[in-house]
Amino acid sequence: MLSALGGLQRCFWAILLLALTVSLLAGFLHKDVRLLMPLLKGQAEGPPITNVMFLKTHKTASSTVLNILFRFAETHNLSVALPAGQRVHLGYPWLFLARYVEGVEEGGPEQRFNIMCNHLRFNLPEVRKVMPNDTFYFSILRNPVFQLESSFIYYKGYVPAFRDVVSLEAFLASPGTYYNESQGLRNAYARNGMWFDLGFDNNAPAEDAYVRARLADVERRFQLVLIAEHFDESMVLLRHLLRWRLDDVVSFPLNLRSPGSVTSLTPEGQERAKRWCALDWRLYQHFNRTFWARLRTELGPRRLRSEVAQLQARQRELQALCVQDGAPKNKSQITDLRLRPYQSGEADILGYSLRPGLDNQTVQLCQRMVTPELQYTARLYTQQFPEKPPKNIPFLGA
């Protein structure tokens, strides 16, 4: 009995001594531990996620995200679900079908790819036929006022609703005069385009129960929805969730318009745009809220500011290293056709030229960062399917 009591006393004093030691160490090291926590949090908690599906919405900075994903695929030797044949999109504006992917045949063996990011209209059952079960799904949204303005300039000659109207302001003053649902899928660019890209009816009434149900559908399917107006914060959060390196998400803005081809709506025009694209407006408002809530939960304000600053510093460093004159150029100034962006509608799309005199390794790094979407799609297609005829990009001969 006495022996047992002695053992208990020794155990008690050992625990007390340990508690005092921990308390003293915490007092001395409190400041240093707090300083180290951001670094410890930045450590990847596992291998990088390599199965990724990005729903590339229109006029939302999505071409820059596509470049990030293409670069990651190329540097890690991953397979990409690329458009079949001479297509440069995955069947858009029709709902996606698996057969729109090169290498997938109806009735043939199953094909699975690591990355999917070219334009498509979302159709989950068909996407699942070509992507693994553990795929990370994400997308990006933009304020529909500015998304619609960009669509108007970019698709002016293509969209029936835009073709005969002098300005977006005039269109929004009387949209029913120009917009006709019966004119087909091309008009999807003129109303609730992001809603349409998600696979929903862009002409549906914005009734509360319907909208809430569709928002819940998006939340169930997509692990993350980014916001174009906060692109750097979006990339920090994406990097965190995918467990990627900083350089994996550093980018230069692609498919960027010159300031002269950007128009501003009046306050009244902006309100009309929100009403006309009411589904997109509800979509954007909802996921803008969830985006910031996710940032607070995953990172917190201090770590977010720190990582955004790191991202921006690295972008400036690479821009100074890679880009001739450190700034984007218009089409006529870009002599390398591999880097010349596609021009559409009334938009003046800017691109980049590389600084001369770069060594081969740096040229490869920089060229990947500034290669436009169509040329990059064509290059990856040739790499993955060398036995197929290469994709023809007609405007490169212009």
UniProtKB/Swiss-Prot annotation:
| GO CC terms in record | Golgi cisterna membrane
Annotated organism of origin: Sus scrofa (Pig)
First-tier enzyme category under EC? transferase
The alphabetized UniProt keywords are: Glycoprotein, Golgi apparatus, Membrane, Signal-anchor, Transferase, Transmembrane, Transmembrane helix
Q: Which cysteine pairs make disulfide bonds? A: none
Q: Which Gene3D superfamilies match?
A: P-loop containing nucleotide triphosphate hydrolases
Primary location group: Golgi
- What's its membrane topology? Single-pass type II membrane protein
* Lumenal-facing ranges: 30-398
> What EC designation does it have?
2.8.2.-
Q: Which family does it belong to?
A: Belongs to the galactose-3-O-sulfotransferase family.
Tell me, what controls this protein's activity?
A: Strongly inhibited by Cu(2+) and Zn(2+).
Report TM segments. Answer: 12-29
One of the GO biological process terms: glycoprotein biosynthetic process
Q: Where are the Cytoplasmic topological domains? A: 1-11
* One MF term in the entry's GO annotations: galactose 3-O-sulfotransferase activity
What pathway or pathways are given for this protein in its record? Protein modification; carbohydrate sulfation
InterPro entries per UniProt: Gal-3-0_sulfotransfrase, P-loop_NTPase
Location comes to: Golgi apparatus, Golgi stack membrane
Q: What does this protein do?
A: Transfers a sulfate group to the hydroxyl group at C3 of non-reducing beta-galactosyl residues. Acts both on type 1 (Gal-beta-1,3-GlcNAc) and type 2 (Gal-beta-1,4-GlcNAc) chains with similar efficiency.
Name the record gives this protein: Galactose-3-O-sulfotransferase 2
Glycosylation is annotated at 77, 133, 180, 288, 330, 360
